[in-house]
């Protein structure tokens, strides 16, 4: 009799004593393990892809991703300007070309070039990850590159901030740059040959 009262007490209190007979548990379907958490980039890429696909579905008539062209992408980028936070001065504005304007103006807020460039990069990758062929990727088209270049240049002029492309560092080749005994590099030039 004492064993019956101790058995229930052990279960309720989380006793580590082994039970005499395990109770059969009803078989419940196990949920699949949670996928690993996405990186910030992957999460943003997924959000951007879903937003773009929703934009295409909202068109009249709706556009399937397989029928998407550069004109749809350009329309999408211009649509996004309404949510921009970067002041871009127009040509008639007194602050056009000034890095730090002294006052307020009514020039529009737009998406910054860097944001658009990063967005296109993510959508380009997402297109291929969702079954698109690289050679038919509308985000990689020349028209998109031209548009981004024009936005970059016009925003740089309007904001007085010149765009400077980062120079790629040359990889150092240890075979080409070995030092000579006199402290000069191993490469020869016409001035070294003349002396």
Curated annotation (Swiss-Prot):
Residues 1-41, 154-195 are annotated as: Disordered. Residues 162-175 have a biased composition (Basic residues). One of its GO terms (molecular function) is DNA binding. It comes from the Eukaryota. Residues 40-167 form the ALOG domain. Its main location: nucleus. PROSITE patterns: ALOG. It holds the Pfam family ALOG_dom. Residues 184-195 have a biased composition (Low complexity). A motif (Nuclear localization signal) lies at residues 165-169. The keyword Ligase does not apply. Keywords: Developmental protein, DNA-binding, Nucleus, Transcription, Transcription regulation. Residues 21-36 have a biased composition (Pro residues). It is found in: Nucleus. The keyword Plastid does not apply. InterPro entries: ALOG, ALOG_dom. One of its GO terms (biological process) is mRNA transcription. Belongs to the plant homeotic and developmental regulators ALOG protein family. Probable transcription regulator that acts as a developmental regulator by promoting cell growth in response to light. This is Protein LIGHT-DEPENDENT SHORT HYPOCOTYLS 7. It comes from Arabidopsis thaliana.
């Amino acid at each position: 009799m004492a064993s019956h009262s101790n058995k229930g007490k052990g279960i309720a209190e989380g006793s580590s004593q082994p039970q005499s007979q395990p109770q059969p548990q009803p078989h419940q379907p196990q949920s699949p393990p949670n996928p690993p958490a996405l990186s910030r980039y992957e999460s943003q890429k997924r959000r951007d892809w879903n937003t773009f696909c929703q934009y295409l579905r909202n068109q009249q008539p709706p556009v399937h991703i397989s029928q998407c062209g550069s004109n749809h992408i350009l329309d999408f980028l211009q649509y996004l300007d309404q949510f921009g936070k970067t002041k871009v001065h127009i040509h008639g504005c007194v602050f056009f070309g000034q890095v730090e304007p002294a006052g307020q103006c009514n020039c529009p807020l737009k998406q910054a070039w860097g944001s658009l460039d990063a967005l296109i990069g993510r959508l380009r990758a997402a297109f291929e990850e969702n079954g698109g062929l690289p050679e038919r990727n509308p985000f990689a088209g020349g028209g998109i590159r031209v548009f981004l270049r024009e936005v970059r240049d016009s925003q740089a002029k309007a904001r007085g901030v010149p765009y400077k492309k980062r120079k790629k560092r040359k990889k150092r080749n240890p075979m080409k740059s070995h030092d000579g005994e006199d402290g000069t590099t191993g490469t020869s030039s016409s001035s070294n040959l003349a002396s």
